[in-house]
Amino acid sequence: MKPRPPAPLESQHLPSETKGVPAWAPFTHRTFTIIWLATVVSNIGAWMYNVATGWLMVSLDANPLTVSMVQVSNTLPMFLFAIPAGALVDIINQRRFLIAGETAYTVASMAFAVLVWLHLMGPASLLILSFLVSVGSAFTAPAWQAIVTQLVPKPELQAAVAANSVGINISRAVGPALGGLLVVSFGLGAPFWINAVSNIGVVAALFWWRPPIKPVVPLPAESFSSGVRTGLRHARYNPYLAATLIRTIGFFFFASSYWALLPVVANRQIGGGAALYGVLLGAIGAAAVGTAFVLRGLKSRLGANWLVAVASVMTGVATALFAVAHGPLTAIAASLLAGASWIFAVSSLNVSAQVSLPDWVRGRGLAMYVTVMFGALTAGSALWGQLATSWGVPTALFIAGAGAVLAVPMTWRWKLQLGEQVDFSPSLQWPAPVTTHAVEPDRGPVLVTIEYKINPNEREAFLDALANASNG
């Protein structure tokens, strides 16, 4: 559901039992509706915050590398903490975990707003606080993905996922434009306060929510360190997840370029203000919302593998348009193309990750996917910022665009899995034990044998001890 990572689950290719469920079915469940509304409001505040942080850094230090570090500080926590967070999600109470993480996010956001309001924010403190705010998102992201099945019945899962995606894309379309308008009208501090206040509704909704009681399993709880090791081991030997991760790197590493450098493009290359920056981000979100209406048909015609390939080529074209944009219209066209390509890739990769995982390791597997995604975004943002500082913004964007196109043939051998033929249910086909006589349920011969391996030098002592035991 929530927040800052791309839509957690998004596709029309979930198991066949979800087919035919109305799109509005999840909203017949009060819990889903309340949490959905709270997260949409919070995500609008988060996108206002994203606009404000990028523009605040431009006003403090317009160096492309420094500006791109804002994107790095926002994505690095997800890379560092998603795997341990995923292990915790599979072990501890998910509701309490979300309450703690969202409360920490709210407190950090309020601290950010206070420092901006008091004019105490500099480039270094902005990056540090951006990192701390994003830590809350990093720890809660796997949990938000994992609780969807607790909010609606399984046949309605696909509709719930689609509703979540619509909510996230609505916030992406509305939030940046409102953020830019707030900066122009009320100053840079306003979006930070709204972001902090908007998340209070999420915390309240989580306190109110009472998840269904699960049957108690009489097994010892898995330890945190063991959970992390098990998740990493599963990811290593799951070929379906491995293919998803490789394709994820191939897309997000190059797509990170325009996210990292868009404030510089809007300010230095086009000569616009915060309002233009908000419009460009809003155009990306609006394109994602519009594309969602044709996504089902495109997936059925092209399939996930081709859809991600098309998304990579579209990203290359969009990045090249950003490189040559010297007016708002070209930049807006690039944003629309980038938004459509983003939703093509994210929808296919998210679902491929979901259906490639069994339930018992789902939180950790999704955390691995999130880690790889944000690792690619983090590394890419830093690289494109450095190249833009050394060779210029247009050159860096052209290189990123060419890389996005070349990534298609380089990663094509790894096919995405949409899960129709993947069965993760436990096998019950165990071989029957070999018996010398028929065994009745209430009687029958039972023979237990115990073998001992004894040092030949201690043979006599062992026989004496065995004789004493049998006589005792």
Where are these regions (language model features)?
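Substrate-agnostic recognition of the 12-TM MFS/MFS-like secondary transporter fold
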Residues: 31-50, 71-89, 93-108, 125-184, ...
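Helix-loop junctions on the cytosolic side of multi-pass membrane transporters
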Residues: 146, 150, 192, 196-222, ...
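MFS-fold secondary transporters
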Residues: 49, 58, 111-116, 133, ...
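Small-residue hotspots at the loop-to-helix junctions and early N-terminal turns
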Residues: 49-52, 56, 61-71, 162, ...
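C-terminal transmembrane bundle of multi-pass solute transporters/carriers
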Residues: 2-9, 70, 80-83, 91, ...
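Transmembrane alpha-helix termini and helix-breaking/packing motifs in multi-pass membrane transporters
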Residues: 54-61, 112-118, 174-194, 264, ...
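Short amphipathic alpha-helical segments
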Residues: 457-472
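Juxtamembrane intracellular "pre-TM" segments in multi-pass secondary transporters
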Residues: 10-33, 212-246
